[in-house]
């Protein structure tokens, strides 16, 4: 992520979680490699794939993401941040 000054912003999610979410997206989207800032929709994501990922996040991490929040997040990094917030009870 970049701030308005062009500096890279640090994610509040652990790098390992971001990697796990990137791998999950790759698995569900049939993509060979998904980067932490890759856009879900640019990768070919759609509503069915989004629901599958949301369900897997609930199963694997115990965090229920809303469809709206998932679609607004758009990247593995931001989804990982939502998972961290959910784990913290925010």
Residue ranges and their predicted role:
Residues 1-90:
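Phosphopantetheine-dependent thiolation modules in NRPS/PKS and related acyl-activating systems
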